[in-house]
């Protein structure tokens, strides 16, 4: 299988997000890379599902709480940016303070 660098990045994000979902389901608090992957994958899927940029940006602030992540992680993530594929093309989505 030949993948572009962008496709490899998406696959890596998805794999890390899957691991984060499983750990969260077991009641473990997510660390920094797990939280980033979890939120990023959810944003990419929401865009693919046809939500607007504004809806995806708002959705990104509802995915995790401080109780879902290790201490200090929310402060390490002031914003998340992801190039997501929407029905009308690829757009940059920025979510400020994704873990309120």
From Swiss-Prot:
Catalytic reaction equation(s): urea + 2 H2O + H(+) = hydrogencarbonate + 2 NH4(+)
Highest taxon of the lineage: Bacteria
Q: State whether keyword Cell inner membrane applies.
A: no
Disulfide pairs here are none
**Sequence similarity:** Belongs to the urease gamma subunit family.
> What PANTHER family does the annotation carry?
UREASE
Annotated protein name in UniProt: Urease subunit gamma
């Amino acid at each position: 299988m030949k993948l572009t660098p962008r496709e490899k990045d998406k696959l890596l994000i998805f794999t890390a997000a899957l691991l984060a979902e499983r750990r969260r389901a077991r009641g473990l608090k997510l660390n920094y890379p797990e939280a980033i992957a979890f939120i990023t994958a959810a944003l990419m899927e929401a865009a693919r599902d046809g939500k607007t940029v504004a809806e995806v940006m708002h959705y990104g602030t509802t995915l995790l709480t401080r109780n879902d992540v290790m201490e200090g992680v929310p402060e390490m993530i002031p914003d998340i940016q992801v190039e997501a594929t929407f029905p009308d093309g690829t757009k940059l989505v920025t979510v400020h303070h994704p873990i309120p």
